[in-house]
From Swiss-Prot:
Coiled-coil intervals: none
Lineage: Bacteria, Pseudomonadati, Pseudomonadota, Betaproteobacteria, Burkholderiales
Protein name per UniProt: Phosphate acyltransferase
Organism: Cupriavidus necator (strain ATCC 17699 / DSM 428 / KCTC 22496 / NCIMB 10442 / H16 / Stanier 337) (Ralstonia eutropha)
Subcellular location: Cytoplasm
GO (cellular component) term, any one: cytoplasm
Catalytic activity: a fatty acyl-[ACP] + phosphate = an acyl phosphate + holo-[ACP]
Principal subcellular localization: cytoplasm
Region called Disordered, residue ranges: 337-359
GO molecular function, one term: phosphate:acyl-[acyl carrier protein] acyltransferase activity
Length: 359
């Protein structure tokens, strides 16, 4: 089965200079992938020519005449830039011409455009942003929501947990992954009313609910999934990124302080290299917008080509493993109190029809 990925080539801080090389590199590693490169055709072709990939058989260029900048407000992205590379890329998913959309563009605009174009799945009130954060166990903890919903009701947190459970089950091949609810303590009496009520709903659900977890449990790998509202999740994510940068900077400073510390750095280099690979932020680039009728992956805006390629892989894995079908089934089962749930359709996306935007 061929997996087609739509790339918003113009998004992010670096645009085509990052997105196009990442797409071509990904194709060299995955024979069953195809790329739909969306954006300004001349800019895309210039990059392809530099990469000697102008006539690549698994690349299609789809024209978009506008670009959503990192500073554009949501209303501009939705109402004024209707032919933006971001919107056209998301539309490729809606029309079944691609299995996933990858964008490094403006997060607020991407969420708004994706929700407007794709709509939410049946039974899901709000989409959520989910990503993987490295942990001591080596596989990473899936955390959501990371900023899509600053305020949540208890039922939303339950929905987030179900969506993440479905994704982790098929992408990470973990049936019945454990779910933790981020709180200020493990005791059930702790937390605000929303969190306490969410805990009750999770305990009564079919999910493999571990209980309340604290911030340090994310890095311990206490549970496979950690659920929280978007305000808390975004603060946790940004704090993690800041701490990682600070530690890296401090280590570099200490090891370059004198000739002796430089010698120690040379001796410790094998260990430091292994640690750097385990904590490489590029490996964890790409946040999934869960709850939509199609796959959308948000890359970090400042990502380089190596990092953006990991975001492409996240979308590729989700499409190949049928994440949307799994989430659809999970919510169909929950809404079938009056009778047997209808099986969710397997939404494969080989891209059977030509796009009117093809350049």
């Amino acid at each position: 089965m061929t997996i087609k990925i739509a790339i918003d080539c113009m998004g992010g801080d670096h645009g085509v200079s990052v997105t196009v090389p990442a797409a071509i590199s990904f194709l060299s590693r995955h024979d069953d992938a195809e790329m739909v490169l969306v954006g300004l055709p001349d800019a895309i072709r210039t990059q392809l020519k530099k990469l000697h990939a102008l006539d690549h058989p698994r690349v299609t260029i789809v024209e978009a005449t506008e670009v959503i900048t990192m500073d554009d407000p949501v209303e501009v992205a939705l109402r004024k830039k209707r032919d933006s590379s971001m919107r056209v890329a998301v539309t490729q998913v809606k029309e079944g011409l691609a299995g996933a959309c990858i964008s490094a563009g403006n997060t607020g605009a991407l969420m708004a455009v994706s929700r407007y174009v794709l709509k939410t799945l049946e039974g899901i009130e709000r989409p959520a942003i989910a990503t993987t954060i490295p942990n001591e166990q080596g596989w990473g903890t899936t955390v959501l929501d990371l900023g899509a919903n600053a305020d949540c009701e208890p039922e939303h947190l339950l929905q987030f947990a179900r969506m993440a459970e479905a994704m982790v089950a098929v992408v990470d091949h973990k049936e019945h992954p454990t779910v933790g609810l981020l709180n200020i303590g493990e005791e059930v009496i702790k937390g605000n009313e929303v969190v306490k009520r969410a805990g009750e709903l999770l305990r009564a659900s079919e999910l493999n609910f571990y209980g309340n977890v604290e911030g340090n449990d994310i890095f311990k790998g206490t549970t496979d999934i950690v659920v929280c509202d978007g305000f808390v999740g975004n603060v946790a994510l940004k704090s993690t990124e800041g701490l990682a940068k600070m530690i890296g900077s401090m280590i570099k400073e200490e090891f370059t302080r004198s000739w002796f510390t430089k010698l120690l750095a040379a001796v410790a280099m094998p260990v430091l290299s292994r640690l750097a690979r385990r904590l490489d932020p590029a490996r964890y680039n790409g946040a999934s917008l869960l709850g939509l009728r199609g796959l959308v992956i948000k890359s970090h805006g400042s990502a380089d080509a190596h990092s953006f390629e990991w975001a492409i892989k996240r979308g590729y894995d989700a499409a190949k493993n049928g994440v949307i079908a799994r989430i659809t089934r999970a919510f169909a089962d929950k809404s079938s109190a009056a009778g047997a749930a209808q099986p969710a359709p397997e939404t494969e996306v080989p891209g059977a029809h030509p796009s009117p935007h093809v350049a």
